[in-house]
Amino acid sequence: MTIKPSRSRTPFKMVNFRFLEYSVEALKAIFEEATGTPGQNIARKNHLTYFEEYFRVLKAKTIIVETPYVDHDFLEDFSAYYVKCFRSYDRFCSRLHFLNIPLSSEFFDNILQSGSDSISVKELNDAYLGFVVVKPIPSTFIGRTCLKTYAPDGERSFPFTHEYEVSLAGLSLKVKSLAYQEQDSIVAACASTAIWTAFQATAFLFQHHVPTPVEITKAAVRYFPFSNRNFPNKGL
């Protein structure tokens, strides 16, 4: 399905949604298509192994692929580094939504148009497992990610999770999580990304601004003029 943008003086791309049956093979193919990373490299990523087990436990049934998606954090990365590269990089990401129920585009259209289907928006929200932003860069492409936690079993504790609001084709959904993303060795190494994740918790508790990973890196090196350039970044 395709969502047309509202009228504006600024040209926008059409937002498209693809509905796929979940499988780790489908997820791997999406990563390969969205990033241009060879399949064998994706297969070696620990993230794919992690997602496979995680979505098995959460009983994922459907992937909704939203393209193009504008991600604030990556847009900052893009303007700080990628737009200046000799190689041309896209500034638009993809966002993958996961559900624990089967869902087709036709069925979703009915929900949007009439809201009278057997599955309500509330039931859709109950089935929502969260999202993964896929950045259009090779290798370190896992962007802002908010996924539902494992069910409480007395052994795991998630004290700093909170609700994130998600707009899916205009439908307001929520997922209780703590956002994280893969470290980007170009603009934000492990320390910057770890601080960004910590800020996801403290911002909810103390109502402060969450700087992007590239802003964290810039702040860290502002008063320490290293001999090497800041980007690509080798760590704080």
Q: Across the structure, where does each feature detected by a protein language model lie?
A:
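A sequence-composition feature that detects small, non-aromatic residues
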Residues: 26-29, 34, 43, 60, ...
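Long, charge-dense tracts
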Residues: 1-146
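Active-site nucleophile-adjacent alpha helix/oxyanion-hole segment immediately C-terminal to the catalytic cysteine
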Residues: 3-6, 10, 14, 156-228
